[in-house]
Swiss-Prot record:
Official protein name in the record: Cobyric acid synthase
Gene Ontology BP terms: cobalamin biosynthetic process
Domain GATase cobBQ-type per the UniProt entry, residue ranges: 256-438
Metabolic or biological pathway, per its Swiss-Prot or TrEMBL entry: Cofactor biosynthesis; adenosylcobalamin biosynthesis
Length: 519
């Protein structure tokens, strides 16, 4: 068997973190384990060493396994560019754009791709921990599903369903999810996990017993709410406006550095700012109103899957004028990827938006033109005198650069990347702030521009260690709060035979049996 699908009752139920925790727990036992998500819909992505693009959650899960990310861990990635269209990335590379309806026509071929990719991983590893997408009970999508029960059926995977108790109604979520599945799908569901519980778990005992009596399936653990888990959010639902990112430690000096990040409608790789939030004395907030910039020291304009449309949103909300005024007062602004493109004088886009040429914010003397081919690479260079690396995922490229514009990054051959003009900086590089020495120099520069002389950048923050600590915490939570013996049984033997089948999904008016054997 050696593989397990972790599904969830909803988006943001905790599938990604539970999968990462199970990966970490298994890896710490010495097992060769790999992550897998057949289809991910996310604008949070990374570039792999093999030159492709996958969802960030699978890169984090790979790190939990002690592996470099690979396109095989996420063979299909959907990157929404609007409410109706998404870019399709197959095995790391762009494979056209689709609408929800046109995508259905590709599902059969893609199912073959994801199953064969999973088969290869299963042959090479002791265990493969698969993550579902959204909910397996989206009955309008089941006929062409390749990410949840469609994958489980095709690959013979036992399924563990995660429910988020913090939303309320977790027992209805779990029971209803199971009951909506058809009989063959229900037979693969071996149990449940309750996630994000606050308080004394003994309060749940009667509910757990009743759920087992109703479904014939146990809850294999109750994971507590963990305030210290905040890195590498998979879902855009996690980027709440006005909420502080992470759990910032007190400043090393006498002043905080306050960072505002416009929460763009099509924000991508918002996790770039998490490295800033890991620093003592740095308070990072996502914002949607210009008034929220009035007390900010630094504005970070993040990436976007729809640069021109999100630039229009900045104008519509008044944030564009507020960002210009912020920089006009000598206060620091930095743009990353799409945010960097917005800071330039002109953007010509016949690829993402098709609108042609539009004016940027005019804060960096550059012009950007979008190309059909997507740039995917993991470059290195120097910035603020420190060695740096990062990764690039973009269609827009500079086609004109002002003679006097300095680069933020200097490439090995001496070429300038990005831009730096007064208190305004920009780069196409994601992951730049994960370089510890550069991040400290950048924060010191930003504090100087903002007149925050009392802010002192910590000299001992290692973002890699912070991330590793988060993964170890996930592994600890799984080991302490889940029935790991039961998870091993699912991995090795699949879902038990004879599990009850519930109406209406299984038909009939009473619980049926999935086959011989006892409950």
């Amino acid at each position: 068997m050696n593989a397990l699908l972790i599904a969830g009752t909803t988006s943001d139920a905790g599938k990604s973190v539970v999968a990462a925790g199970v990966c970490r727990w298994l890896a710490r036992t010495g097992a060769r384990v790999a992550p897998f998500k057949a289809q991910n819909m996310s604008n949070n992505s990374v570039v792999t060493p093999d030159g492709g693009e996958i969802g960030r959650a699978q890169a984090v899960q790979a790190a939990a396994c002690g592996l470099e990310p690979s396109v095989r861990f996420n063979p299909v990635l959907l990157k929404p560019g609007s409410d109706r269209r998404s870019q399709v990335v197959v095995l790391g590379h762009v494979s056209g754009e689709v609408t929800a309806m046109s995508y259905r026509e590709r599902k059969a071929a893609l199912l073959d791709t994801v199953v064969s990719t999973l088969d290869g991983l299963r042959a090479e590893h002791d265990h493969v921990i698969c993550e579902g997408a959204g909910s397996p009970a989206e009955i309008n999508l089941r006929a062409t599903d390749i990410a949840n029960m469609g994958l489980a059926r095709a690959a013979g995977l036992p399924v563990l369903v995660v429910g988020d108790i913090d939303r309320g109604g977790v027992f209805a979520q779990l029971f209803g999810t199971l009951a909506l599945l058809d009989a063959a799908d229900q037979a693969l569901v071996g149990g449940f996990v309750i996630n994000k519980f606050r308080g004394d778990p003994a309060l749940l005992d009667s509910g757990l017993d009743r759920l087992r009596a109703l479904t014939g399936r146990p809850v294999h653990g109750v994971l507590p709410w963990a305030e210290d888990l905040w890195l590498d959010a998979e879902d855009s639902l996690s980027y709440v406006a006005d909420g502080v990112v992470g759990r910032p430690a007190p400043p090393r000096g006498s002043q905080w550095l306050r960072v505002a990040v416009p929460r763009l409608p099509r924000i991508s790789n918002a996790t770039d700012v998490e490295a800033l939030a890991a620093e003592p004395g740095v308070a990072v907030r996502f914002v949607t109103e210009p008034s929220r910039l009035t007390d900010a020291d630094l504005v970070v304009l993040p990436g976007s899957k729809s640069t021109v449309a999100d630039l229009g949103w900045l104008h519509d909300t008044g944030l564009a004028d507020a960002i210009r005024a912020h920089a006009g007062a000598g206060l620091p602004v930095v743009g990353i990827c799409g945010g960097f493109q917005m800071l330039t004088r002109r953007i010509t886009d016949q690829v993402e938006s098709g609108v042609g040429a539009v004016d940027g914010l005019g804060m960096l003397d550059l012009e950007i033109e979008f190309e059909e081919a997507k740039t995917l690479r993991r470059p290195s260079g120097t910035a603020f005198g420190e060695p740096v690396d990062g990764y690039e995922i973009h269609h827009g490229v500079p086609v004109r650069r002002g003679d006097d514009l300095a680069g933020l990054v200097r490439l090995p051959g001496g070429t300038a990347e990005g831009g730096l003009s007064g208190s305004v900086a920009g780069t196409h590089w994601h992951g730049l702030f994960e370089n510890d020495a550069f991040r400290r120099r950048f924060l010191t520069w930003a504090a100087g521009c903002a007149g925050r002389d009392g802010f002192v950048a910590a000299g001992d923050t290692s973002f890699a260690e912070v991330r590793a600590g988060q993964l170890d915490l996930l592994g600890d939570l799984v080991e302490k709060h889940l029935d790991t013996d039961a998870i091993r049984r699912l991995l090795e033997g699949g879902a038990p035979a004879g599990l009850p089948l519930l109406p209406p999904g299984a038909g009939g008016r009473a619980a049926l049996r999935s086959g011989g054997g006892s409950e």
